[in-house]
Structures are given as C-alpha cells and as structure tokens.
Amino acid sequence: MSTDELAALPWRLDSPLSAVPSAVDAQLKEYLSRSQEEFSPIGSLVGGAITVLNHFIVNGGKRVRPTFAWAGIRAAIEGGGGSPDALCGKGGDATSSSSADFNQGAILNALSAFEFIQACALIHDDIIDRSDTRRGFSTAHRTFESKHRERGWLGSSGHYGVSQAILIGDLAFAWADDLYNGSGLSATALQRARPAWRAMRTEVIAGQILDIALEANGSEDVADSFAVIKYKTASYTVARPLHIGAALAGANEQTQSMLRNVGQDIGEAFQLRDDQLGVFGDPEVTGKPSGDDLRTGKRTTLINEALRSGGEPQVAALRAGLGKGEDSTEADIERLRDIIYDTGAQAKVEKLIEARTQRAIESLQAGGLGADITAELTQLAEKLTHRRF
C-alpha cells in the first residue's frame, strides 16, 4: 500500500506505526494551510516568513517523534493498562465510525504537535551550528539571508537571516502547544500527560544549553557528551514521546517506566548513530555535508572517545585538525576520519549502539505488551539505530 493510500485511511487505534509519517504529513499540511490564511491580513512580508517555516516542516523529516508517541498510545492500549476510553473520554470502540472520526482528528493533531517542537529545535540548532544545509535544502536562516541579499535590503543579510529564523522557530514552538492542547483529546488525557509534555520541552532546551556550554569550556569528557545525548536528543526524540503517548492513553506506571527506559536506550543509540554518520556518512544519503562535526570541532561522543582512546600522536593530530571550519580541505577531513577510525573509537561507539539497541529490544519483549506493538517497536528500533541517513 502506498503512503498516499495509507494517509487516506480512517485512523484507527490499531493503525500501524508505518502509517504515522504520511498521516502526520497530511495533518501538518492542513494545519499549516489554515495558519497561512490567518497571517495573510498582516501582509506578504510576514506571509513570506511563514512560507519558509511551512517549507521547512513539510519537506523532509522522518516523523520519528509522532511515531513513537503513537507507539506509546498503542502500547498502553495493547497490554499496558490503558484503554481507548482513557485516551478519548468517550466510546472506546475504535471500529465504530464516531470513534474513528474522533480519533483521526484528535490523535493526529496531538501527534503532529511534536513536529513543531522539532522544527523549532532544528531551526535554532542550525543557527547555533552555523549550518548551511538541512535535508538537502538551504537552512532557514540561510534562506532568509539569501532573500535579503537578493532584494538589496538595508542592513546585514546575515543578521536578518538569523533574526527571522529565530522568530519562526519561536512560532513553531508556540504552535506545538496550540496544536497539542487544542487537539481534541479529552482534558483528562491531556492533564495526565502534561508533566511529561512540559518535561520534554524543558529537557530539549536544557540539553541545547548544556551542549553550547560544554563546547565553550572545551570539555572532552565522554560523560559530558552523553549528558547532552540524554537531554538534547534521547529524551525528547524517543523517551518522552513514548511516555507522553502512554500517559495519554492511561498506561499503568510499570508500562510508562518501561517505555521511558526503552526510549532512553533507543534514543541514545539513535544519536550515537547520528554522530557516526556526521563523520562517516554519505552526504548523498544523509542530506548533510559529511565531516561538519570535524570542521566545527564539535566534541561528540565519537570524537571524545577518539581523544580518550588514541595515542599521543593521534590525539595531537586530532586537536590540531578539528575546528578549522572552511579552512579544512577534503583531504584534511579524510585524514581526521582515518585517525578516528584507527583509534578504535568508531568500533567502540558501534558497540554502544548495539548494546543499547539490544537492551531496549529485550525490555520490550519482556514488557508484557501485545505481540503486534512489540514487533513493530522492535522493528522501528532496529531501523533507526542501523540507518544510513
């Protein structure tokens, strides 16, 4: 079945995890279209900025967070102590037309809200990292910068680009709350999940603050880079979406705790894979320039492990070569890759990925959930932690 056909199906409480991305895409397009209309009276200058945000959200993205939130909902209902009644506050028969209609709008609104937080995080992260491309397109701040330059406007094009990108990122963060709290899910369900929703928003920002501070103080401690992974990525990418979905559907505390732990392991493995791809990935597949972490000198777990494991000449060469920005040639980047590989860091990080993925899968299989959601979550964990993009 094609993604378009999946998106057209009525949403049911047993809809597969694989159906989430296309369904969320359709929901996002509908919400963004309405939002664009709301801004039209203000004028084209604001409307143009909203168009950049719309393009950023609609084009690309794996919809990982909505998928895990849906997994949390299904896990709660399929053996985790939850129910459709707890989620919707009415009905409970997901095959009835009224319940299906309610679920399709309310549930997909709540799932789609995660993508606005992700948009804010990525737009701001690209500014912080001075990135030029994202998902094969120009980053938001570079897009605004180019428009300013092309039109011959006053002032600094770079400052204009950063300023506008900050604002549309802030807007995305606000829209996340609007869409989530106005989703149509029951007030009781939203209240039950509110602590986890609030924690997720705080953790991702705290993780970014920590990341910037550690970069500034020059920390090369693997424990520090893992702390960034925990809060900036693992918690808000996997652990909290699973937690929020389970809480919305009324999962018992045992299931919620198990899913948080599973999510933390998958999320850490997901980010460790991202660190590997940032150095060794194929730009044609990832959509991002290879070696950016080497050019910026970002102390990821992979790089910190290389600095810890390497011999004195290797460590000296890494420190001399990291963070040279655009002065780094392709030959320089390739040399750094070779050094990192030779220290054994790449192999050690690969083992960390495998250990966390396996622990998550074993916890899922022992978690008492239904066979279908256990199998789908296992497959998703393996897909994300062994990806090439």
Q: Across the structure, where does each feature detected by a protein language model lie?
A:
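Conserved N-terminal diphosphate/IPP-binding helix and adjacent helical/loop segment
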Residues: M1-L111, A119, I123, R130-G158, ...
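All-alpha helical catalytic cores of prenyl diphosphate-utilizing isoprenoid enzymes
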Residues: P41-G43, I57-R65, S163-W175, N181-F280
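Residue-level signal for inorganic ion chemistry
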Residues: F68, A176, G207, I303, ...
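Well-ordered alpha-helical scaffold segments within catalytic/enzyme domains
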Residues: A71-I77, W175-S183, R240-L248, A306-G310, ...
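C-terminal helix-coil-helix/basic helical segment that borders enzyme active sites and/or dimer interfaces
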Residues: I77, C88, G92-S99, G245-Q254, ...
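Active-site alpha-helical segments that house and flank conserved acidic catalytic motifs
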Residues: A106-R135, P195-I205, H243-A246, Q254-P283, ...
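Divalent-cation-assisted or electrostatically stabilized phosphate/pyrophosphate-binding catalytic cores
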Residues: R135-G169, G218-S235, S257-N261, P283-S309, ...
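Short hairpin/turn module used for nucleic-acid contact or packing/dimerization
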Residues: E334-F389
